């Protein structure tokens, strides 16, 4: 079976759980022999990938469009049945209207300051790393402006046009679209090709925005869900939102839980644990309303009222980080809270090595991969009951996100009672092995077949 997959991000350039999930699922599909063409927007990240073929909105219907299939693809070691192609779009994961506008302004400033002979400025301003203009007979679609007038939704629809051009030159059986920014593209390609669309709901506007829902984004999500042949939800929690808030028939929805890469051995790392007399409690994730960072700090203050040898680490970035720094200071606990910014690689392994407990206080978490990553690294976890992962994880402490007293009590219990911490660590590390991407991939293949047959 051949899948045209539309996503926001793909390793090594990731900013959150969506990229990790896309990679895990795509690799497992490849291991099952499923052919995947993965289309993703440039978003500024993949300009370092010199072998990525980039389409530009300036010539989607131009002279080169009819000259044949674009033949320069990005291939990834270990993914035998996967090809990736990047389209020249500023879309990026977890984007909002404000962050989209800021990104356009940054790229515009880069163009303004780029001077001849200044390679760093030129590289910052360039839409793609093209060392020379293509010959007139070269295949593919290139050129055209990469900075667009208009808003984020306009960019979403421009991305849809570029994806439709990719689809014209490739054969596939099913379209698989991840989250709302790719839904219009999926609908467009489905209408043009007659092939079934499967949308994958990793989060909804209600998860991201609470009561402050953006009506236009909601409309895009709803149109994608209703226009799709099948809807994959990452949890029963998400399925409930999809059916109750978007009016999608329950029989059209399939729950496919996320997973984690399982190697059968502890994760290899050269990172040493930094010895400290303090207990370390870790928050790891985007610092946004959805993740509940203010509840983490409120619980931290209560913990520090009864324990003075605890430090709280907030690892991540997001639109609430400045507010959380100010809140920690206002609470009088700023000296006990460390904000690290976004972490990856060895820096991420360092904080896991230091952590005595990982806390996920999310207000609304469709799934939540970070607790599985923590358990895989022998870190016990305390998770919000308002999360998808709480449906399937047994050996974890659970709490309502708003119950800061109970959250603080459970943090103290783990830190003060080593046998409890040891039990959670050992049982959790064993339990996490059951979350395999191959199982998720097999479930998706079943959905593809059902979509293709109906």
Each model region followed by its residue ranges:
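A conserved catalytic-core segment of Leloir-type glycosyltransferases
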Residues: 34-167
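Short alpha-helical donor nucleotide-sugar binding micro-motif in glycosyltransferases
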Residues: 342-343, 350-355
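Conserved donor-binding/catalytic core segment of Leloir-type glycosyltransferases
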Residues: 232, 273-300, 425
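Nucleotide-activated donor-binding/catalytic signature segment of Leloir-type glycosyltransferases, i.e.
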Residues: 323-343
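Carbohydrate-associated surface elements
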Residues: 237, 259
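Aromatic "clamp/platform" in nucleotide-sugar-dependent glycosyltransferases that forms part
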Residues: 363
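Short hydrophobic beta-strand element within catalytic cores of glycosyltransferases
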Residues: 380-383
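Conserved acidic donor-binding segment of nucleotide-sugar-dependent glycosyltransferases
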Residues: 396-404, 413-418
């Amino acid at each position: 079976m051949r899948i045209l997959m539309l996503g926001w991000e793909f390793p090594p350039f990731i900013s959150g759980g969506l990229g990790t999930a896309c990679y895990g699922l795509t690799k497992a599909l490849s291991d099952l022999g499923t052919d995947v063409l993965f289309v993703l927007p440039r978003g500024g990240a993949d300009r370092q990938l010199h072998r990525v073929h980039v389409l530009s909105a300036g010539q989607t219907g131009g002279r080169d469009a009819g000259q044949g299939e674009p033949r320069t693809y990005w291939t990834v070691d270990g993914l035998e049945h996967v090809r990736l192609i990047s389209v020249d779009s500023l879309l990026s994961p977890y984007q909002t209207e404000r962050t989209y506008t800021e990104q356009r302004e940054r790229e515009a400033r880069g163009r303004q300051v780029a001077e001849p002979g200044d390679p760093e400025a030129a590289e910052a301003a360039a839409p793609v790393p093209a060392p020379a203009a293509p010959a007139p007979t070269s295949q593919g679609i290139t050129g055209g402006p990469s900075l667009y007038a208009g808003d984020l939704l306009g960019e979403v629809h421009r991305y849809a046009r570029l994806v439709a051009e990719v689809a014209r030159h490739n054969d596939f059986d099913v379209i698989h679209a991840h989250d709302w920014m790719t839904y219009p593209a999926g609908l467009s390609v489905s209408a043009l090709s007659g092939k079934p669309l499967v949308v994958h709901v990793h989060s909804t506007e209600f998860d991201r925005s609470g009561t402050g829902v953006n009506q236009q984004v909601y409309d895009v999500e709803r149109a994608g869900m209703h226009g799709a042949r099948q809807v994959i939800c990452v949890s029963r929690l998400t399925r409930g939102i999809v059916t109750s808030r978007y009016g999608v028939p329950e029989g059209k929805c399939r729950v496919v839980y996320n997973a984690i890469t399982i190697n059968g051995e502890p994760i290899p790392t050269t990172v040493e644990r930094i010895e400290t007399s303090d207990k370390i409690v870790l928050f790891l994730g985007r610092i946004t309303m959805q993740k509940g960072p203010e509840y983490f700090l409120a619980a931290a203050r209560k913990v520090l009222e009864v324990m003075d040898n605890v430090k709280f680490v907030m690892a991540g970035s997001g639109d609430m980080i400045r507010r959380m720094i100010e809140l920690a200071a206002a609470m009088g606990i700023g000296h006990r809270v460390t904000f690290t910014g976004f972490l990856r690689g060895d820096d991420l392994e360092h904080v896991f090595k230091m952590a005595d407990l990982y806390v996920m206080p999310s207000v609304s978490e469709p799934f939540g991969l970070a607790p599985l990553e923590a358990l895989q690294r022998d870190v016990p976890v305390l998770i919000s009951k308002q999360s998808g992962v709480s449906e399937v994880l047994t050996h974890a402490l659970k709490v309502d996100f708003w119950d800061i007293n109970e959250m603080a009590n459970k943090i103290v219990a783990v830190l003060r009672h080593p046998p409890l911490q040891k039990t959670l660590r050992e049982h959790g590390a064993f339990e996490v092995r059951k979350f395999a991407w191959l199982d998720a991939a097999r479930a998706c293949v079943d959905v593809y077949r059902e979509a293709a047959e109906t």
